[in-house]
């Protein structure tokens, strides 16, 4: 039987490995909305999602933080400011927590995975739309002199459809991946999930 110290060590190692995997994945990104090609999708949230179901929400958040921190160290941020990396971290948390809450409470059936994914996508879209309007876009305009045009149009026709599409793509990959890994996640997760249909 594993001691608490051994379990904690394995948890920290697992989070570190998944954080490194997430950092690798963030470097492979692509645009999806015409006109805002600087907004790009990547699948670096997948290790965070896996980690969340293995180690709980704090584990998933820690993995997202490690990814964003390593990416900031690698790139130096935006003129030295971690605007994009902090935004990426907030986006991950906004998607992860509603997804985890729904699946943990309601169960791991396909319908509940879809429900959790929809909750995560809508939360992600709402949070990032507000954050871009009031904080992120103004910061980019101030730091990089980057003009996005009329703010409301940028959010409505750029940020909002981008995050809806991003949430959809991440959700599809998550549902497929969870279906493949479900027995292993249920067996090895530190937090027991409701397996009811």
Where are these regions (language model features)?
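Loop-helix junctions at membrane interfaces
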Residues: 1-197
């Amino acid at each position: 039987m594993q001691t608490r110290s051994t379990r904690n060590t394995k948890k920290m190692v697992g989070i570190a490995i998944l954080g490194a995997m997430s950092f690798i994945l963030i470097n492979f990104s692509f645009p999806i909305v015409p006109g805002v090609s600087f907004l790009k999708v990547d699948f670096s949230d997948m290790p965070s999602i896996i980690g969340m179901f293995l180690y709980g929400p704090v584990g998933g958040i820690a993995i997202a933080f490690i990814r964003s921190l390593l990416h900031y160290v690698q790139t130096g941020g935006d003129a030295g400011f971690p605007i994009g990396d902090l935004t990426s971290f907030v986006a991950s948390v906004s998607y992860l927590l509603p997804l985890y809450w729904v699946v943990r409470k309601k169960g791991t059936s396909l319908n509940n995975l879809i429900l959790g994914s929809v909750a995560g996508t809508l939360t992600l879209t709402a949070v990032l739309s507000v954050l871009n309007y009031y904080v992120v876009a103004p910061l980019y305009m101030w730091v990089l002199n980057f003009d996005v045009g009329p703010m409301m149009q940028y959010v409505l026709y750029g940020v909002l459809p981008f995050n809806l599409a991003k949430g959809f793509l991440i959700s599809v990959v998550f549902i497929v991946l969870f279906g493949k890994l479900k027995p292993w996640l249920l067996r090895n997760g530190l937090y027991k999930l409701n397996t009811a249909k």
